[in-house]
Design a protein with these regions (language model features):
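Non-catalytic accessory regions flanking glycosidase/transglycosidase catalytic cores in CAZymes
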Residues: 1-224, 229-238, 262-263, 267-301, ...
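Active-site His/acidic residue clusters
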Residues: 242-257
């Protein structure tokens, strides 16, 4: 068995663990909203029509923020359709996903759900088919406490106090040709800058996210960020990044090192933002909102929207069923986000329920946990204090795209007298033993590993417990030397205290 050596020291702090790293995403797409978080008439629905079983799992997952209402959906959305008396709301076509929306769930319903879920709302405005005025109207409806027309409309709809939403996304994936209202970098930069400037006239304390690239593979990546940030620099706080990964023709081993791409993506966006700041002699730091990320098998049938005259409400779309290998990759992506906590200020796993999601909810039926639920929930629960830089020296994997990369990847966090190490063994065949130098006086509190002899195993409504994190009995702490065996294709959490 080969060995990887790691050093953990509370002095090697990268930055604070940000609770916003553990965000999620609710879009009017497939069954995420309707028969997902919202299903009036379900046995577990509360008086607002919210599924309490989904709410319970959302809290167990440890979600901190939720981005709403999209996604591609937002670029054709008229927010006014989703407020006011439900019986008067229009039924609209959703061009993004070739579906239709009855608008029985809208802004006020989402805000009520957010309170019950204990999450911070992150709103997106439509800069595809709409612009500055419509964004200002939504902001006024949500945040203004006075006697303005839209504040009064909110009160008439039963909400006296403003929602005071802090984080706002200025559109969605405007670099993508698939986006309704797709724009060039110059076109988008101009409308984003004007929208941001005007929104701050209403509420100077907003945290605004400008659209970055939809993936590192986009042909405009880099140049898009440069042009957009040059125009919007003084008006925004963060730039978005989106990335999805799935096993492709290169095979399982290449898929298992997907986090190498996320690392490079974050580093390159950071470098581009810093270069823009240097060019204009600004000391301001632009953060990254990695507000769409996950494993998503985009080449599979569930990802294909309806066609022709079929415009269903809440069709089954993007309902990927995740394997153990997928869960290991998700755990590794969380490691990447954490170790870049100095630049990643917010993140949203896409999405929360039913649609490429950790939570599944059957119509008129039960909920169940996908494999990817576990690394997210445990990382959210136990990543506290500061993120520590981890030095790794161990066996490597020959990646087709990234060259030689470490088989074991890891990050650690430390808060007061307790620390946690999150690790993945990305080798598809070999167990690797880790030897970790830890601070003196520690004791081992918990060691759990998620793995399976069958890395293709998937959970279902009938069985979501056969494969879950289990105690790793190989973990031993002897003085300042912590050892543990990491099976091939596994995710592990080691908790320490002193």
């Amino acid at each position: 068995m080969r060995t990887a050596r790691l050093v953990i020291n509370p002095a090697f702090a990268v930055g604070p663990v940000r609770r916003r790293t553990f965000g999620s995403f609710v879009e009017h797409l497939g069954r995420c909203v309707y028969t997902g978080i919202y299903e009036p008439g379900h046995a577990n629905a509360d008086d607002d029509g919210f599924r309490t079983d989904v709410l319970d799992l959302t809290r167990e997952l440890g979600v901190s923020t939720v981005r709403y209402p999209g996604g591609n959906f937002v670029s054709g959305y008229r927010w006014e359709d989703g407020v006011g008396p439900v019986e008067k709301r229009p039924h609209r076509l959703d061009l993004a996903w070739h579906s239709s929306d009855p608008n029985t769930f809208g802004t006020d319903e989402f805000m009520r759900w957010a309170v019950k879920a204990g999450i911070e709302p992150m709103m997106a405005v439509n800069l595809g088919t709409r612009g500055v005025q419509e964004a200002l109207d939504l902001l006024e409806y949500c945040n203004v406490p006075g006697v303005s027309h839209l504040a009064e409309q909110r009160r008439a709809n039963g909400v006296d106090e403003p929602y005071r939403v802090r984080m706002w996304c200025l559109g969605n994936e405007m670099d993508g040709p698939w986006q309704i209202g797709h724009k060039t970098p110059a076109e988008y930069a101009r409308v984003a800058a004007e929208t941001a400037r005007a929104m701050r006239m209403i509420d100077p304390g907003l945290e605004l996210v400008v659209c970055g690239s939809s993936s590192r593979a986009m042909p405009t990546f880099g140049e898009w960020e440069r042009q957009v940030l040059t125009e919007t620099w003084e008006h925004v706080d963060m730039v978005s990044a989106h990335a999805y990964y799935w096993e492709q023709d290169a095979g399982l081993q290449e898929f298992l090192v997907s986090a190498e791409d996320m690392d490079r993506f974050i580093d390159q966006v950071s470098a581009t933002a810093d270069a823009v700041g240097a060019a204009i002699k600004s000391d301001k730091v632009i953060g990254i909102s990695f507000d769409e990320w996950n494993v998503w098998y985009q080449d599979r049938t569930p990802s294909r929207p309806p066609t022709g005259d079929d415009w269903p409400v809440a069709p089954r779309l993007l309902e990927d069923n995740y394997s153990v290998a997928d869960a290991v990759v998700v755990g590794n992506l969380l490691i990447s986000l954490l170790r870049h906590t100095d630049r990643v200020w917010s993140a949203s796993q896409a999405q929360l329920v039913n649609v490429i999601a950790p939570i599944m909810a059957e119509p008129d039926g039960p909920t169940w946990k996908q494999t990817i639920f576990h690394p997210f929930a445990l990382t959210s629960a136990h990543a506290k204090g500061d993120v520590l830089r981890v030095v790794i020296d161990g066996p490597t994997i020959a990646s087709q795209e990234f060259g030689e990369v470490q088989a074991v990847d890891a990050v650690a966090t430390w808060a007061d007298d307790e620390g946690t190490v999150f690790l993945v063994n990305r080798h598809e065949n070999e167990t690797v033993q880790v030897e970790i130098d830890v601070p003196a006086g520690c004791r081992l509190v918990e060691a759990v590993t998620l793995t399976s002899d069958d890395p293709r195993w998937q959970a279902s409504a009938e069985d979501d417990t056969t494969v879950a994190p289990r105690a790793n009995d190989t973990a031993v702490l002897d003085g300042t030397r912590l050892t543990a065996d990491l099976p091939a294709i596994s995710w592990t959490m080691l908790r320490l205290a002193r």
